[in-house]
């Protein structure tokens, strides 16, 4: 049994969540085209991106002749009314996203892929998040903190954005970017146990 794992992600939240489990993480690049296909549903898009990131990371590992540790990739999508809300590219886009989420319930999909020994294991987790009604002053003050700019849907549940969440049905860590319960189950399939069972 080993606990070393390649994490092909730039998300500091994913790194922190996995380090809290006592895993030795190694960075691995996984650059892909993340453009959505026409009429692609949010959960399908999310799963595809996590899978393609994993395949890209596997190719990098092989090309660089790196040790054969399992590879973990993940992706997160926020969706409301069938529209995918990615990371805002500018402040006005963040304003528009937060206005769409204000006072409403939206879906957060988090896909996780773990590969080892030429096998790929994957799951997708869905959560429903309800925002309180936001005033314009709250939206602009939140955006001024800079927090929304690197997060799908323009908010972070684990930080200041958490004050907008009226109700969560699902996984708190999933909305952060990595559903821990499901992730640990996938890791077990590649012989990484967080705790002995």
Swiss-Prot record:
GO MF, one example: nucleoside triphosphate diphosphatase activity
Compartments reported by the entry: Cytoplasm
Catalysis: reaction(s): a ribonucleoside 5'-triphosphate + H2O = a ribonucleoside 5'-phosphate + diphosphate + H(+); a 2'-deoxyribonucleoside 5'-triphosphate + H2O = a 2'-deoxyribonucleoside 5'-phosphate + diphosphate + H(+)
Cofactor(s) the protein needs: a divalent metal cation
EC category: hydrolase
One Gene Ontology biological process: nucleotide metabolic process
Name this protein carries in UniProt: Nucleoside triphosphate pyrophosphatase
Organism (species): Haemophilus ducreyi (strain 35000HP / ATCC 700724)
Upper lineage: Bacteria, Pseudomonadati, Pseudomonadota, Gammaproteobacteria, Pasteurellales
């Amino acid at each position: 049994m080993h606990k070393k794992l390649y994490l092909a992600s730039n998300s500091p939240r994913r790194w922190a969540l996995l380090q809290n489990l006592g895993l030795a993480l190694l960075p691995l690049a996984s650059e892909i085209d993340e453009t959505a296909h026409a009429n692609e549903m949010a959960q399908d898009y999310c799963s595809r991106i996590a899978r393609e990131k994993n395949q890209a990371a596997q190719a990098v590992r092989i090309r660089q002749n790196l040790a054969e540790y399992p590879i973990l990739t993940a992706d997160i999508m926020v969706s409301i009314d069938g529209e995918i809300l990615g990371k805002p590219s500018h402040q006005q886009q963040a304003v528009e996203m937060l206005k769409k989420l204000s006072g409403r319930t939206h879906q957060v999909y988090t896909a996780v892929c773990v590969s080892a020994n030429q096998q790929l294991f994957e799951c997708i987790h869905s959560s429903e998040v309800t925002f309180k009604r936001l005033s314009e002053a709250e939206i602009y003050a939140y955006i001024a903190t800079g927090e929304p700019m690197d997060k799908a849907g323009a908010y972070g549940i684990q930080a200041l954005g958490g004050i907008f969440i009226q109700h969560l049905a699902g996984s708190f860590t999933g909305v952060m970017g990595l559903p821990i319960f499901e992730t640990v189950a996938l890791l077990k399939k590649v012989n990484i146990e967080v705790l002995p069972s």
